[in-house]
Structures are given as structure tokens and as C-alpha cells.
């Protein structure tokens, strides 16, 4: 019951998220990825509060000035580059609810590299992605509401994730024309990625970060792709993917 009180699911846009009011962040963001969502609008930089969530629960990291304290970037969970078909779609990725305090080198390095790898696996069928953050034991904290070295009087403590993850699912052929629910287990492929939140990764992506969806479910306690057969979620075959 307590978890239900502090968490809320947002479904009324082109992605779905589970937002945690105490963490001031989404624990996961789920979204379809297809060419219909990508175009030439580019980054709107439309940093704003999420209109579907009370502002007191959101990190104050919106507007042109407000950021997290010190070395933390405003890290997207659904990437801006995954929603460039229209300015409206792109602007929704800049809501504060989609941000977490992310180390700048991690954000612009290994995480950006992984985001690019995910896009390389787009196909005629839809690619399904869930991006999330995990707060392990001993997580640190930062503050929101900073502009330069100055803090807003209403600045809040914001937990910093210890890990980030992605799980992805698509048809093997990429052009089956079938919904996932119409596919047998031999027609689907899935994989996950689990990264410790630190700043000393090499710039290039490595398959050592690959895990099964089942592994990430065990780490986080969440169930992803609930209608998909278990044998698909046990897969961890990097050679099946463009990585």
C-alpha cells in the first residue's frame, strides 16, 4: 500500500512511466521505438515541469537555468533523439519527470553510446524499450533547483541512482507485420543492459554490459513484457543484435 501511495503510473502520452514521488524520478520509462517517432524536429530544449504530476514531487530541473547540483546532468530516460518527429513529441522528453541526476561523463559517454546502439536495432516492426534507474544500498544524494552555484530556496534532496538499465524486445525478422502477442517465442528476441552509475567507462560500448531481461527483473523486482514467454526473457545473445 505504501508503494502505491508514493508511486504513480503515467500513460497519457507517447510513453509510459512509473514515477516515484519520494525519489522525484521515474523508476522506469517504457516506449515504442519506430521510424514514425523520428524525424527532423531536433532538440527543442523545452525543459519543463510535467503537467500530469504535482510540481512538489518533481525535481526542479526545468527552465533554462535550474539543474542538479554540481557534477550531475539532467539525464533523459527516454532520449530526446528517440522522439524527433514533431516538436511536441520531443518537448515531452524534456519534462522533469523524465530526468534523473546522471554523472556528466556517464551521460555523454557510455549511456549515449548505448542509446545509439538501441536505435540501430529499429526495424519495420516496432522495437519496444524500457529504460530505468535503480537505487541500490548506499545510494548518494544531490540537490535540485541549482543555477550556477546558487540554490533555489525550495531546493530538494534528490537520490542518485546506483545503476541504470534498458530492456528491449522486437521480432527476429524485423518485418513480420505481426503484433508481439501474435508471435511465437521463436519469432521474438529480447536483451537487457545493466550498468553501474559511474564515470570511468570507456567511450565505446561493450557487450559485457549485456544481461537477460530475466536478470534485470530479478535485480529490480519489476516484471517487463508480461505477455512474452519466459524463454524469450531468458535470452542474452549479443550476436542477435547490432551492438
What are the residue ranges of the model-derived segments?
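Generic preference for hydrophobic
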Residues: 8-9, 30, 129
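Short, His- and charge-rich active-site/binding loops that engage polyanionic ligands
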Residues: 13-77
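Domain-level detector of nuclease and nuclease-like folds
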Residues: 57-243
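Single conserved hydrophobic/aromatic residue that forms the stacking wall/gate
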Residues: 1-6, 10
Amino acid at each position: 500500500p505504501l508503494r502505491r501511495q508514493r508511486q504513480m503510473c503515467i500513460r497519457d502520452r507517447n510513453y509510459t512511466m512509473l514515477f516515484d514521488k519520494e525519489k522525484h524520478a521515474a523508476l522506469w520509462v517504457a516506449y515504442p521505438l519506430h521510424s514514425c517517432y523520428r524525424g527532423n524536429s531536433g532538440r527543442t530544449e523545452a525543459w519543463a515541469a510535467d503537467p500530469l504530476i504535482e510540481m512538489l514531487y518533481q525535481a526542479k530541473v526545468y527552465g533554462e537555468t535550474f539543474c542538479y547540483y554540481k557534477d550531475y546532468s539532467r539525464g533523459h530516460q527516454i532520449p530526446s533523439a528517440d522522439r524527433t518527429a514533431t516538436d511536441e513529441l520531443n518537448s515531452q522528453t524534456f519534462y522533469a519527470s523524465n530526468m534523473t541526476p546522471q554523472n556528466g561523463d556517464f551521460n555523454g559517454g557510455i549511456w549515449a553510446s548505448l542509446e545509439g546502439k538501441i536505435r540501430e536495432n529499429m526495424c519495420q516492426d516496432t522495437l519496444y524499450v524500457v529504460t530505468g534507474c535503480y537505487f541500490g544500498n548506499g545510494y548518494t544524494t544531490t540537490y535540485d533547483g541549482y543555477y550556477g552555484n546558487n540554490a533555489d530556496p525550495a531546493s530538494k534532496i534528490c537520490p542518485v541512482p546506483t545503476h541504470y538499465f534498458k530492456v528491449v524486445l522486437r521480432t527476429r525478422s524485423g518485418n513480420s507485420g505481426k503484433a508481439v502477442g501474435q508471435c511465437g517465442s521463436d519469432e521474438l528476441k529480447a536483451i537487457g543492459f545493466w550498468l553501474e552509475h559511474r564515470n570511468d567507462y570507456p567511450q565505446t560500448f561493450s557487450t559485457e554490459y549485456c544481461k537477460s531481461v530475466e536478470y534485470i527483473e530479478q535485480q529490480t523486482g519489476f516484471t517487463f513484457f508480461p505477455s512474452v514467454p519466459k524463454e524469450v526473457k531468458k535470452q542474452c545473445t549479443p550476436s542477435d543484435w547490432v551492438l
